[in-house]
Amino acid sequence: MTNKYLVEGSENELTTKTAAELAGLIHSREVTSREVTQAHLDRIAAVDGDIHAFLHVGQEEALNAADDVDKRLDAGEAPASALAGVPLALKDVFTTTDAPTTAASKMLEGYMSPYDATVTRKIREAGIPILGKTNMDEFAMGSSTENSAYGPTHNPWDLERTAGGSGGGSSAALAAGQAPLAIGTDTGGSIRQPAALTNTVGVKPTYGTVSRYGLIACASSLDQGGPTARTVLDTALLHEVIAGHDGFDATSVNRPVAPVVQAAREGANGDLKGMKVGVVKQFDRDGYQPGVLEAFHASVEQMRSQGAEIVEVDCPHFDDALGAYYLILPCEVSSNLARFDGMRYGLRAGDDGTRSADEVMAYTRAQGFGPEVKRRIILGTYALSVGYYDAYYLQAQRVRTLIAQDFAKAYEQVDILVSPTTPTTAFKLGEKVTDPLEMYNFDLCTLPLNLAGLAGMSLPSGLASDTGLPVGLQLMAPAFQDDRLYRVGAAFEAGRK
């Protein structure tokens, strides 16, 4: 199977080039940022009726930002960043002052934020035009974008299948040539899982290294913004733009940004000699799609052929990660989403003079939240209630500690861990929507990393022999060793060419 949206490209070859290539053309003045931005806006107009990657397209704002870059470059100024002038798609969970921020929920339909998220601000300061805001599962709760209040995103590889979630819009935009760069968020795999299903690269940085200020919270101890692109180098260049300490975020870590771009360039030689790669025993067993396991084993053998030493690693508490995650996350959701009460901002329903304030609040939440969000609020509220807090929430936090200890022990033996990113390739839209537990299981390989706050990457590892659809290879690195992801990821990418 091929991705006709990218393989066949479009009338304009600018939409099939990498971000690094586009930056080189713009900075050398062979093309203008306006030309590149307009090409991608035209591409969005041509194919987004099929894909539905975007919830909002800001044509005027994007072109104005591109013109500003061109003006500065023509005046002889140095580029504001290595990606200045290259346009980007932004997940609709980061606040923006010039475009609606809805988190794909009716609760925030049409909401205009009075401030930019720190990630948004850094993108603007880097001279990167924002093409628009991408589709997602409502409040980042889901694995397929089917929980979006505005309809699902379709996978460019097969329009009947999901592009993943929660950030399926960002990855689909990359895969369809609608954007060369995109930003996502990852709570339990929402960057890495869509990347795997769309044959793109997605990175969940170490927790605390990318600011969450202005990121609409799902689960505050798990959420992390991160970069996505079509190549490892492009992803590294964007990572460098958005990472860094932020005084507006109490969980932001004050330490130097890992040298991710340097690592990606060094890894491009394809050499993995001296690298110890751990294969996680719990993620390499029967029950996964045969084509996924076949591609994973081929990827491991490729790394061996590139000089890596392969070691099997046992992480026994990973088997308990799913249960712990789906207790901790709903508890944090229950707390975070209490702010959407119909009183201060967002939707206010049923305020016709016949209802009390409490009734208006209840009616607003009933009308504004979708079924999955309500399910998680109820589950979290129950788990936090008197008599159940110790039995459920605290026990889940103990398991979380054990998972972090499993990772720590593993990194005493190896430099990096690998696994399939997802148990199967992209499933058909509607296939799992009536079975929440089946949907939750799809994040099995990705969520342990979030519980431990470590760094992870998904990158293309070929097509499954049984479905012809993309398979992702997941790399997992210790905290604050994000550059190791890029070193190994770039080498693996080079070895596949």
UniProtKB/Swiss-Prot annotation:
What the entry lists under PROSITE patterns is as follows: AMIDASES
Is Endoplasmic reticulum there in the keyword field? no
Q: Keywords on this record?
A: ATP-binding, Ligase, Nucleotide-binding, Protein biosynthesis
| GO-annotated cellular components | glutamyl-tRNA(Gln) amidotransferase complex
Signal sequence extent? none
Keyword ATP-binding assigned? yes
Gene Ontology MF annotations: ATP binding; glutaminyl-tRNA synthase (glutamine-hydrolyzing) activity
Region Disordered: what ranges?
Answer: 143-171
A GO BP term, please?
Answer: translation
Q: Which family does it belong to?
A: Belongs to the amidase family. GatA subfamily.
The protein's name in its UniProt record: Glutamyl-tRNA(Gln) amidotransferase subunit A
**Taxonomic lineage from the root:** Bacteria, Bacillati, Actinomycetota, Actinomycetes, Mycobacteriales
